[in-house]
Amino acid sequence: MTPAQLRAYSAVVRLGSVRAAAAELGLSDAGVSMHVAALRKELDDPLFTRTGAGLAFTPGGLRLASRAVEILGLQQQTAIEVTEAAHGRRLLRIAASSAFAEHAAPGLIELFSSRADDLSVELSVHPTSRFRELICSRAVDIAIGPASESSIGSDGSIFLRPFLKYQIITVVAPNSPLAAGIPMPALLRHQQWMLGPSAGSVDGEIATMLRGLAIPESQQRIFQSDAAALEEVMRVGGATLAIGFAVAKDLAAGRLVHVTGPGLDRAGEWCVATLAPSARQPAVSELVGFISTPRCIQAMIPGSGVGVTRFRPKVHVTLWS
């Protein structure tokens, strides 16, 4: 079995079709089918068959699917460790929700990376629905965001630890019609909602709140950051959903007003997710133990910026209107 064969088969399993796998891998349909055929011949197992409802996998095909993810992950991890050993540096890859990446990751990365001169941190932003896949495939070492056992799974392969509670609140400018009293649902639906990138995640907390409030999509504008959405609210009006501690200073200074009422607040909790302790690298275990300490919590809440020599951001694109 070759990595190319396993990569093609893993993509077919994850995406549910040869065509989708080919598009993701940049191969032709025939190329993916060739890799699958080679695996079928070597293992003497059909692996899957096509049905009217999609692909139906044999027991052996399902076993290969889980093993393929593990093997490819170990291959990638080994390559990283060899490179680290050659250059005398360690790399910690963090996947984070957009809200955590904007509001808490800077302070965390600066403080944690300052503990070791040989450590570089790479941060990428992903929806929490991808956390399990990213961890199991070893595409990242650790994932941080509003994860839960329902989204990550409770089969023991993923370690999950909550570490910081927060509130999502509704805020407006002081001159907004929502600033006084408890607003009626119709008035909420009539407002322009200036939203950060978290609103673009269909299964995220912000999207859930917006659905609960029945805010029409035509009244939602999504910006590249929560800070940009807040700036627009203070400049032209409208409402936004924000992490409570991130807007505490603006609320205290009177630049924003907290709007209360049914569905306008939501409690959340950030969690750290990794492979089981026996399978993760030492730097991950260090971060898991460090992230819930009072010193680290204090660093994450205000956010103190990131030293550019320590932080390697991955390129990602956010679309906004």
From Swiss-Prot:
<dbReference type="GO" id="GO:0000976">
    <property type="term" value="F:transcription cis-regulatory region binding"/>
</dbReference>
<dbReference type="Pfam" id="PF03466">
    <property type="entry name" value="LysR_substrate"/>
</dbReference>
<keyword id="KW-0805">Transcription regulation</keyword>
<comment type="similarity">
    <text>Belongs to the LysR transcriptional regulatory family.</text>
</comment>
<dbReference type="GO" id="GO:0003700">
    <property type="term" value="F:DNA-binding transcription factor activity"/>
</dbReference>
<dbReference type="InterPro" id="IPR005119">
    <property type="entry name" value="LysR_subst-bd"/>
</dbReference>
<keyword id="KW-0238">DNA-binding</keyword>
<keyword id="KW-0804">Transcription</keyword>
<dbReference type="Pfam" id="PF00126">
    <property type="entry name" value="HTH_1"/>
</dbReference>
<dbReference type="InterPro" id="IPR036388">
    <property type="entry name" value="WH-like_DNA-bd_sf"/>
</dbReference>
<dbReference type="InterPro" id="IPR036390">
    <property type="entry name" value="WH_DNA-bd_sf"/>
</dbReference>
<dbReference type="InterPro" id="IPR000847">
    <property type="entry name" value="Tscrpt_reg_HTH_LysR"/>
</dbReference>
<feature type="DNA-binding region" description="H-T-H motif">
    <location>
        <begin position="18"/>
        <end position="37"/>
    </location>
</feature>
<feature type="domain" description="HTH lysR-type">
    <location>
        <begin position="1"/>
        <end position="58"/>
    </location>
</feature>
<protein>
    <recommendedName>
        <fullName>Uncharacterized HTH-type transcriptional regulator Rv0377</fullName>
    </recommendedName>
</protein>
<dbReference type="GO" id="GO:0006355">
    <property type="term" value="P:regulation of DNA-templated transcription"/>
</dbReference>
